[in-house]
């Protein structure tokens, strides 16, 4: 005969297994969602002046390319948006810590923690002939995430969006990291 302590131990192990199985199921769904989007992006069209759209019903990914070839591309803009009235819960601290392969580290410039909004920029930015070049990543739970590269000309006092050269491998890694993070909702 089992004692009350043994029964409680067995119940707690059963519930912890159910909780773990639920988490593992959610993790598998998130991974499958990210892999589905990445496969759509890999299929293209990898053509100059094209926009690649991919969606899994929860997330919509847009990649705007100025040019591309078999090795790399000129990325104009990357966006990840929620669909069906969903919102994204993206951790800017994770991005600041993990996305370090763009040549310039991204740092949080502004954050409204209560609203889940954040602005990250290259820090330090690249300076060249009176022009400052930097990445800008904007996070808004309702609007999604956008990554752009800008050039600010101090003499003109204006900034313009500029394409950034990336290898396909770097772009795929960036997309995989951001889609995976956005899929954790």
Task: Cite the ranges covered by each PLM segment.
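The feature represents the first ordered module of a protein
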Residues: 73-136
């Amino acid at each position: 005969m089992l004692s009350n302590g043994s029964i409680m131990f067995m119940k707690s192990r059963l519930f912890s297994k159910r909780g773990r199985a639920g988490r593992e199921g959610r993790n598998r769904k998130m991974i499958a969602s990210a892999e589905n989007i990445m496969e759509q992006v890999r299929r293209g069209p990898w053509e100059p002046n094209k926009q690649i759209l991919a969606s899994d019903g929860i997330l919509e990914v847009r990649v705007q390319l100025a040019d591309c070839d078999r090795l790399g591309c000129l990325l104009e803009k990357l966006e990840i948006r929620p669909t069906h009235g969903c919102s994204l819960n993206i951790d800017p601290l994770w991005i600041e810590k993990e996305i370090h392969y763009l040549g310039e580290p991204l740092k949080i410039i502004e954050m409204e923690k209560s609203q889940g909004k954040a602005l990250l920029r290259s820090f330090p930015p690249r300076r060249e002939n009176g022009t400052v070049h930097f990445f800008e990543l904007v996070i808004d739970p309702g609007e999604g995430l956008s990554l752009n590269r800008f050039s600010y000309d101090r003499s003109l006092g204006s900034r313009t969006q500029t394409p950034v050269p990336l290898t396909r491998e770097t772009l795929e890694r960036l997309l995989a990291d951001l889609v995976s993070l956005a899929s954790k909702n």
